[in-house]
From Swiss-Prot:
Entry's localization field: Cytoplasm
Cellular component GO terms held in the UniProt record: cytoplasm
Entry EC no(s): 6.1.1.23
Protein name, entry field: Aspartate--tRNA(Asp/Asn) ligase
The organism's taxonomic lineage, starting at the top: Bacteria, Pseudomonadati, Pseudomonadota, Betaproteobacteria, Burkholderiales
InterPro entries, per database record: Aa-tRNA-synt_II, aa-tRNA-synth_II, aa-tRNA-synth_II/BPL/LPL, Asp-tRNA-ligase_1, Asp-tRNA-ligase_1_N, Asp/Asn-tRNA-synth_IIb, AspRS_core, GAD-like_sf
Keyword GTP-binding recorded: no
Gene transcribed to yield this protein: aspS
Residues annotated as binding ATP: 220-222, 229, 491, 543-546
Any one Gene Ontology BP term: aspartyl-tRNA aminoacylation
Region listing for Aspartate, in residue ranges: 198-201
Subunit structure as annotated in this protein's UniProt entry: Homodimer.
Positions bearing the site annotation: Important for tRNA non-discrimination: 32, 83
Length: 599
């Protein structure tokens, strides 16, 4: 018999009476009146092993076994006694009567119990190998594998070719910071780890590969958040000779396929499409969570001439905005709740949170409860009630500031209220999956510090055909052929139709204040390639980490990555990054200059 005949979790009634050889780890050991029970665990689950004292040598070995010992068990499958079955396990109707027990490797006492759900993330990441033994982590990483496999199956079936692109490439610092790799053989020069395979996949389209994909690591040296890592994985795709609509349809079908085959979820037959401008107007976000049934009401024009300066000042400012959200039955919220929300929006730059409780609509301003009503004229009060659709028992929250602050703060408040216990109890949030496309993004954003336009997506995104003239006359009006796939408030994929003509790409560089000499130095290889009959092409990249996080219901993408970094971009398991010795630095022609200590 080989070392292992079956996985522990796959031993079922079909094997009754048969001899098996199992390998795994001790999940739990119990001594019941001279009989020892061992729950043996492997990646497929648990099986109960019974060690009785009839076999003295085996029983003696079982007495010395402790949690996380690695064992080989040989025995016979038998039914569990009546009343001792466990419906929660695949193997819950059987047990294995142990004939031979071999300790393949003992274990020191683990620093925590694997079934402890209250571990700190620091503990989990420091002892990641043990953390990965936990059933939830096993489930998450196997789910990740299945998502990748199903994406590959779909793309393979449509003629996409998996092509690897370089990991050591050229630094083109547009956007996030690059991770740099010094070149020993070219002193003073550096490679960069790719933030995406963007330019290489475009070159593959010029090279007539037609359809490309890659499940690929990408790197960005940026401040981390719950949904960011310095190294992350993309399902990266590019295709030639398809329109924007055809590209969206193709990859919408891919996501539907992946969800159906991996977690049995049927997504909408057709994802809704929303303009970027509409998303910002209604939700203050370009990745709206459509499960939350709260929307913005714009009031900027209605409060321009009120005495309340908190409203009228931003309402008369070029980039100002005044908006509100009506919360049905929000009149039930206590003053403590309102104060808590006020502190919450300050995180996003808001100076405060104005509110009106609607006690009785029919009474007009007399039916409203708020410290701000006295500062609003009748026309403004009427507009607020009518536009928000306020009813008795509602509360209206307001934000008034620069548009970005209003969108960020009121958008965050919308989600917080919607997903709160109050929101769930009052039907303000739906369950399930709400996908959509957000399209027609601005081509450029204005950087006040540098006094120039920067690419909102990246500088290789094509402008809409009817906006080509704006590249040289009015870049702020220029919209892009860009699209994001959004699911439950997360951007899970982003892409665009690319620029395939050299003269258009050069115009975009000029709009970005990248002169011809700089463009040739940084992107000459692309500009040259575009002159050799480059085909119309476009693509998309999906965040594999984000998709799996959502499917698994995990709190962080660190729960679906085997060996993630912390929010300080450190690996607590290996203690990376680490110092290197002086000899290595000399070989790389590098001298360290430590930052000045902060006072």
């Amino acid at each position: 018999m080989s070392m292992r005949s079956q996985y522990c979790g796959l031993v079922t009634e079909e094997l009754l009476g048969q001899s098996v050889s199992l390998c795994g780890w001790v999940s739990r050991r119990r001594d019941h009146g001279g009989v020892i029970f061992i729950d043996l665990r492997d990646r497929e689950g648990l099986v109960q092993v019974v060690c009785d004292p009839d076999r003295a040598e085996m029983f003696k070995a079982a007495e010395g076994v402790r949690n996380e010992f690695c064992l080989q068990i040989k025995g016979v499958v038998r039914g569990r006694p009546e009343g001792t079955t466990n419906a929660a396990l695949k193997s819950g109707k059987i047990e294995v009567l142990c004939h031979e027990l071999i300790v393949l490797n003992p274990s020191i006492t683990p620093p925590f119990q694997l079934d402890d759900d209250n571990l700190s993330e620091t503990t989990r990441l420091t002892h990641r190998v043990l953390d990965l033994r936990r059933p939830q982590m096993q489930h998450n990483l196997r789910l990740r594998y299945r998502v990748a496999i199903e994406a590959r199956k779909y793309l393979d079936s449509l003629g996409f070719i998996d092509i690897e692109t370089p990991m050591l490439t050229k630094s083109t610092p547009e956007g996030a910071r690059d991770y740099l790799v010094p070149s020993r053989t070219n002193p003073g020069q550096f490679f960069a780890l790719p933030q995406s395979p963007q330019l290489f996949k475009q070159l593959l389209m010029v090279a007539n590969f037609d359809r490309y994909y890659q499940i690929v690591k990408c790197f960005r040296d940026e401040d981390l958040r719950a949904d960011r890592q310095p190294e992350f994985t993309q399902i990266d795709c590019e295709t030639s000779f398809l329109s924007e609509q055809e590209i969206r349809d193709l990859f919408e079908d891919m996501i539907r396929h992946v969800f159906k085959e991996t977690i049995g979820v049927t997504l909408d037959e057709k994802f809704p499409v929303m303009l970027y401008s509409e998303a910002m107007r209604r939700f203050g976000s370009d990745k709206p969570d459509l499960r939350v049934k709260l929307e913005f009401t714009d009031l900027t024009d209605a409060v321009r001439d009120v005495d309340f300066k908190v409203f009228s000042t931003p309402a008369n400012t070029k980039d100002g905005r005044v908006a509100a959200i009506r919360v049905p039955k929000g009149g039930e919220l206590s003053r403590g709740d309102i104060d808590s929300y006020t502190e919450f929006v300050r995180i996003y730059g808001a100076k405060g949170l104005a509110w009106i409780k609607v006690n009785e609509v029919a009474k007009g301003r007399d039916g409203l409860q708020s410290p701000i009503v006295k500062n609003l004229h009748d026309e403004a009060v009427k507009a607020i009630i009518e536009r928000t659709g306020a009813q008795d028992g509602d509360i209206i929250f307001f934000a008034a500031d620069r548009a970005k602050v209003v969108n960020d703060s009121l958008g965050a408040l919308r989600l917080k209220i919607g997903h709160s216990e109050f929101g769930k109890a009052n039907g303000l949030v739906e369950t399930g999956w709400k996908p959509l496309w957000v399209v027609d993004f601005p081509m450029f954003e204005y950087d006040e510090e540098d006094n120039r336009y920067v690419a909102a997506h990246h500088p290789f995104t094509s402008p809409k055909d009817e906006h080509l003239e704006y590249l040289e006359t009015d870049p702020a009006r220029c919209l892009a052929k860009a699209y994001d796939m959004v699911l439950n408030g997360w951007e899970i994929g982003g892409g665009s139709v690319r620029i395939h003509r050299e003269e258009v790409q050069s115009k975009v560089f000029r709009a970005l204040k990248i002169n011809a000499e700089e463009a040739q130095a940084k992107f000459g290889f692309l500009l040259d390639a575009l002159q050799y009959g480059a085909p119309p092409h476009g693509g998309i990249a999906f965040g594999l980490d984000r998709i799996v996080t959502m499917m698994a219901g995990a709190d962080s993408i660190r729960d679906v990555i085997a060996f993630p970094k912390t929010q300080r971009a450190q690996c607590l398991l290996t203690q990376a990054p680490s110092e290197v010795d002086e000899r290595q630095l000399r070989e790389l022609h590098i001298r360290l200059r430590q930052p000045e200590p902060k006072v």
